[in-house]
Every structure is written in structure tokens, then in C-alpha cells.
Amino acid sequence: MTAAILRAGARTFLSVRKHRNYRLFFTGQVISNIGTWMQRVAQAWLVLSLTHSPFAVGILALCQFMPFTLFSLIAGVVVDRLNAWRTVIGTQLMQMVLASTIAVIALAGVARPWHVYVIAALMGLVQVLDAPSRQQLTFRMVGPLELPNAISLNSGVFNGARIFGPALGGVIIAAAGAGVCFAVNAASYIAVLAGLLMMRPQEFHAVERRARPRTLYVGLKEGISFARNHEQIRLMLMLTFVVSTFCLNFNVLLPVLAKHTLHSGPQVFGLLSAVFGVGALIGALVSAHVSRATVGTTAVGSAGFALCELLISPLRSIALIALLLFLGGVFFTTWSSNSSSLIQLAAPDHLRGRLIGIYFFAFAGTGTLGGIMSGWLTALGGTELSFAVAGVAGLSMSLYVWLRSRTVPLVEERPAEELIAA
């Protein structure tokens, strides 16, 4: 039994064991993502404390995610022109400066809502370039064979931090204020930057280089044309767009579900958020262990995620809703990590940044539209209607993609090599 557990753990963390550069990156991300989630909680709390307005918190979310809506497509073109390793060093350094700035403002006691909005918008703008660059760097660190494993581990780090970061942030806010959370986040970037600077660029996976497009417009046109004509990538982008738009609006739905539908308080809201995060973490680790991405598995993941939301719609039991959110988290990372892997594996080296940019537009750039739509549906028919519409939309697109996947030539890598327990 012990040997089997060791073999399973070795396979799950294969990219960490096998690639020194990725091991440094992974360690830094574990620390930095916790700081990032602490900052998100602290920003929302600070704005709410200053304004006493939920609408003001909504504006904060708009500032954070609008850059993805506006600039994700162009960012992908820019990423293809840059060195991913140097770009990530620059974007992480800029985020550390921004976190330090809001920390100083908050600790000095002079923070105003517009300060938080500006920092959040600038942080979002930097992350538009940082996110596809980190994906590009992940490919360079591990290569195509271990890419599904590494992407799943990245997702696991993000969702693990999603559990612990807000909890730790809440404790620090209560004990010392939001400014300390910002300072801790700023300090967390030291771990990332140290890992990046310790990497050996000569060990990066080689990629094909081609002449740059004459203009950003030409480069974007090339990426969109390739995505439109490559059926596997087109299917993944269509699925991502629909599921992200309809099913990923928990920031709007969960507070309303807890307060108005279940007539509960912040404790229930925290519980529901946490169980989804736990499920997402487990799903990421399972995906990392499997280390193989397929269109069919991706469609099953999105269908399971959508089905959980559909089943939540009529429920009034906190226990059952928590169970479905946990399962939804497992299916969520099964879908998201597989879809990202498939797009990158199918992408030519010279177009990978552009296709990742298009993916991030479909995944994160639709948050503004989805949030507005969920708010409208909730006002019209409560969370019951919002969850029902999300479930039906996600299931319908998942079924279409699954049926198409039976005729699509897959671009899949063989599973990562089998490990023998040490």
C-alpha cells in the first residue's frame, strides 16, 4: 500500500520531480498564489469598509477583470514576440511594486476607494500579459509530454491557495488590517522572482522561431484564423466560452444563494466557497496524476460541472448544495486543465502565445458579460433561474463537443512515462 501511494504521488508531481526549472517555478507559485488570494479578499474588504456599498465591490471586480476582456487577444500576439522567461520576471516585479504601493497607502491610513480601483485595474492589466506568458513558460520548462501534468499542478496550486489564502487573509485583516495583507502579498513575490532568477534557460524546451508578423493586427488575424480552422482548438474555445460565460459566476451567485435563497450568513457563504475550492484542488491533482488530456474527458468534465449547477437550482439543503459544489469543483478543474492543455498541445510554437491569449479571452474575458447576465437572471428569477440556465447551457455545449470529438482527429501526447518508486 505504501509503495502504491509513493508511486501515485511520484506520478502526480512528475513535472516537479523531473524538471528543475519547473520545481523552482512551482515552489514560488505556491507561496505567491496564497498572497494573491489574500490581496483579493483585502481589496474587497477595504472597499466595503470605506464605502459600505456592495455596488462599490462590484466596481472593484469590474476593474480586475475588464482588462482581460479588452486586451487578452492583443496580449497573446505580444507574448509571441517576447521571451516568456524575461516577460514573467518583469510582470511579477510589476505586481510586487503595485502590491507594495497599495500596502503603503493602506498602512498610512490614507486609502480611498479610487486608490484600490486604480491598483486593481493596473494589476489586471499586468496579469493580462502575465497569464499567457506563464503558460508559455510552463511549456518551455516541461515540454509537451509533461504539459498536461504541469498545467494541472498549476491549477492545483491556484485552487489550494483559493482555500487557504482567503482564510489567512481574514485572520490578518481582523488582527492587523488590510494593509498587512497587501504587504504580505508584496513580499510573496520575492519567492517567485528568486525562483525565476535561479532558472537555467539552457534547459528550456526548444521551440520553433519564425519571423514576427508585420503588425499586431496581422498577428492577431493569423491566430484567429488558425483557431477557426483547427477543429480541436475551435471546439475547446467554444466550450470554454460557453461554460465560462454561464457557469463561472460564483462571485455573483454564491453570496445571493447563501443570504437570500438559503437565508444564511457569511459562515455559509464561506463554507460553500471553500468546498468548491477543495473539490477543484482534488480535481487538479487527479488530472495531474492521469497526465493525459483528451477532448472527451474535457467534455465530461464540463458536463459534470454544468450538471452540478443544474441540480443545485431547486435545492434548499446546505449539505446537498455543498456536496454538489464539491463535485462541481472536481469537474471544473478536469475541464479547465484539459482544455488548456489541448489548446497548447495543438498549437504551433510560433502561434502558441496568440492561441493562449484567445483562450484567456474565452476563459476570463467573458467574466464581465457573465456577471452581468447572472445578475440579471438572479433579479428576474432568483438563483434558481441562474443555476438552471447555466446548467442547461453548459450541458448542451458539452454534449455537442463530445459528439464532435468522436470524429475529430485528436492531438494528444502519450501519457508521461511510468515511474518506478524509489
Each language-model region and where it sits:
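Alpha-helical transmembrane-bundle signature of multi-pass membrane transport and export proteins
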Residues: 1-422
